[in-house]
Regions:
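Small-residue-enriched, tightly packed secondary-structure blocks
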Residues: 1-195
Length: 195
């Protein structure tokens, strides 16, 4: 988890989605695609330690004068229960089905801005070694059922993994869980946001 994502936002996140190497291609009409993992705090109202991840895919498109391609890493902080449950549906369009915004950056960045307080999801990206807030508005985030089946050896939904704890975290997820439990062990959200 990058150092320039404000610690107070990490501590208040109910879930985190990590999407490494999202591919962006553009020749007049652009598109992006990537796969990654969503991991949530366990227990009632997401107050426990980090649990087993569910696999997700990000897809997006745009039109404009553009040429080229690149790979970008994304970290999405899901800031409340409503945002978490929206993402766990079959698919969610960021900005339409869930309020998304580019997250503030820097250790001293304040989390009290209007954009941050209204957003259900804050997005960060890294290209060429630099992490910054970026908007993913208009992109679609959906469960990657095939990847979940491959990871857990059976069909299991994101809701069953993240909310109901129906599967144990696989060995491949232990490093991410350990990093998150070390970096942000407790949910410090306002109790009102957890309802």
């Amino acid at each position: 988890i990058p150092d320039n994502i404000p610690q107070d936002l990490l501590d208040k996140a109910e879930c985190i989605i990590v999407l490494p190497s999202v591919k962006k291609l553009a020749i007049g009409i652009g598109g992006s695609y990537g796969r990654g993992a969503m991991i949530c705090r366990g227990g009632e109202n997401f107050t426990g330690s980090w649990g087993a991840p569910a696999m997700f895919a990000l897809e997006g498109g745009n039109i404009g004068i553009q040429l080229g391609g690149q790979a970008t890493d994304f970290v999405l902080l899901i800031m409340n229960v409503k945002g978490a449950k929206s993402v766990m549906g079959s698919k969610v369009k960021l900005g339409a089905d869930a309020a998304a915004a580019a997250g503030p950056k820097g250790r001293t960045a304040t989390a009290a801005t209007d954009v941050v307080m209204r957003a259900e999801i804050l997005s960060y990206s890294r290209s060429r070694g630099l992490f910054a807030g970026i908007s993913l508005e208009g992109s679609t985030l959906r469960q990657d059922n095939g990847a979940n089946k491959k990871l857990y050896g059976r069909e299991v939904s994101a809701r069953e993994i993240l909310l109901q704890g129906k599967v144990a975290a696989p060995p491949a997820a232990q490093k991410l869980i350990s990093i998150l439990n070390g970096k942000t062990p407790k949910n410090l959200s306002d109790p009102k946001s957890l309802q």
